[in-house]
Design a protein with these regions (language model features):
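Extreme N-terminal signal-anchor transmembrane helix of membrane signaling/transducer proteins, especially
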Residues: 1-17, 21, 256, 260
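Conserved beta-strands of PAS-like sensory domains
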Residues: 102-104, 109-120, 138-173, 191, ...
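Short hydrophobic alpha-helical segments used for membrane anchoring or interfacial signaling
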Residues: 90-97, 179-190
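Extracytoplasmic/periplasmic sensory segments of membrane signal-transduction proteins
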Residues: 21-120
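Short, hydrophobic beta-strand elements of compact beta-sandwich sensory domains
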Residues: 147-164, 213-256
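Cytosolic-side ends of inner-membrane transmembrane helices, especially those
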Residues: 258-273
Length: 274
């Protein structure tokens, strides 16, 4: 009986450790994808930042200079996007006069470009109030992950559409309740990676590696140093117990049979003694 009890407890602990290890591995895969996106954005922004002369001509040059510089800058941006499959498009806006300078945006409408440019200007206004330089969020009719670089009077934004962001690994592969959240440095959820569940979107979450809600929910979080984003995997108690229930019933039956056999054996020994 004691051996069976020990086996039951150890099996549960091993299952829990296995699930946590699985979640941790999945979080690390998410993080590699995030880092890959932001590395691509960095490379693209660095390339465009080397064209400040062209941007200056667009902002302050003659009409002819502006046209020439815009064409050359667009060529450079298009090369950056085409050569980098991680990015959907890149956009440059002049923050001083709030003009959209150029956009390498295959398959993106003019209205979306304008919405993104407006978003950049709003971010610059927020930065004056002490906000950080790098941003990532959802905007417009489609969701985007954005990384933005600002010169003195211009801004570059490299974007990745949500439907290509973390699309190949989602929590739908964990149908028994596991969920993954993407949060910013303030703990605000910017994407729920469990398909069809939006209960956490936009909410501020306490993310820490500890037991929550009377040991009913485990939250494991990992931060990307490059992107400043947190990936958090959550495991509910049902996630453990659902897989464990079949084994538990089987072990319980074995324990009952073992106890019954012991009782019969003790009864037989008692009769033999007397």
């Amino acid at each position: 009986i004691w051996l069976l009890t020990a086996y039951t407890v150890s099996s549960f602990l091993l299952l829990k450790e296995s699930e946590e290890s699985s979640v941790w591995s999945t979080i690390q895969i998410y993080m590699k994808q995030i880092d890959s996106k932001f590395i691509a954005m960095d490379q693209c922004v660095e390339g465009i930042a080397g064209n400040q002369d062209l941007i200056g001509q667009i902002c302050y040059g003659s009409p002819a200079d502006r046209y020439y510089a815009a064409v050359e800058l667009q060529k450079s941006m298009k090369r950056d996007v085409i050569s980098n499959t991680e990015l959907d498009y890149v956009l440059i806006a002049e923050s001083l006069n709030k003009n959209l300078i150029a956009a390498s945006t295959p398959g993106v409408s003019y209205g979306e470009k304008e919405a993104i440019a407006s978003y950049i200007w709003n971010l610059m206004e927020k930065e004056d109030r002490g906000r950080p330089q790098w941003y990532y969020t959802k905007i417009g009719t489609h969701a985007y992950i954005a990384k933005i670089y600002r010169g003195s009077n211009w801004s570059v934004a490299a974007f990745s559409k949500e439907n290509t962001f973390l699309s190949d690994i989602r929590a739908k592969e964990y149908p028994d309740g596991q969920s993954f959240l993407l949060t910013d440095a303030n703990g605000v959820c910017v994407e729920n990676l469990e398909e069809g569940n939006s209960m956490y979107l936009g909410e501020t979450l306490e993310i820490e590696d500890s037991w929550k809600n009377d040991h009913k929910k485990r939250m494991i979080s990992l931060k990307s140093d490059r992107a400043g984003l947190y990936i958090t995997g959550m495991i509910g108690s049902n996630h453990f117990l659902g897989k464990f229930s079949t084994n538990s019933i089987l072990i319980l039956l074995i324990m009952v049979l073992a106890i019954g056999c012991d009782m019969i054996l003790l009864h037989y020994i008692h009769r033999e003694i007397h």
